Amino acid sequence: QAMRDAVAATKVGFEAVIADLPRAVAGGRGERWVEGVFGLHARHEGNGIGYDSICASGDHANTLHWIKNTGDIRDGDLLLLDAGVEVDSLYTADITRTLPVNGTFTDAQREIYDAVYAAQQAGIAAVKPGNKFSDIHAAAIRVIAEHLHAWGLLPEGVSVEDTLDTEHGQYHRRWMVHGTSHHLGIDVHDCALATRVEYMDAELAPGMVLTVEPGLYFKADDLKAPERFRGNGVRIEDDVLVTADGCENLSAGMPRTADDVEEWIREVQSR
């Protein structure tokens, strides 16, 4: 229940940010404004933020842990908001949504977003008792690799299977540089000091809570990336409970598909 409470409080903070996006754009240093708005609601709804909020607009989303939050938020940017409320029990949520600042994804932004969403769906589908923790990343990263291959971004002659080879491949890591999951609870990276056999290679069991958070990141100066993608970074992260026969997405109440995110922004800003 503590995790459900943390997720519910985090949704309040995200919706407060969405409601205030026009002011964040107009006032300058919008990343700081977003950080402040979320922090205010985190402190009011719970004990405070669970970790330093990542409020990364435009190209800043391509810096994995952008916590400086010093930049402007501009019309046409994507805002990557990675934040969580720690409730009074000290359990914390850890959720990421990537939001089109003006309420509408461009075609290129949607193309990236849809790829990440498909990867996350694959990762969530791998969350079930008996699967290894590492199976989540394997499922998600295969979808990422398939999209990069379809876009012609893998080196000539390199197949999806080639890049997934852990010893001789990994070409996809130029654009997806992190793991897809971590355990979550009292610590935002729960059990982070566990051995590999107790963590990455361990079987999932009912009651575990973990994140599923693939992403794609195209720096503004990345000449290997299609020009239409440059300066856009997308991550989608949800908090998932392992159940007896599969999993439950605890943060399913926060929209994830591109269409639903656009509708969410319209609905919140019309209140």
Regions found by a protein language model. Give the residues of each.
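Active-site neighborhoods and metal-handling regions in enzymes and metal-associated proteins
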Residues: 1-271
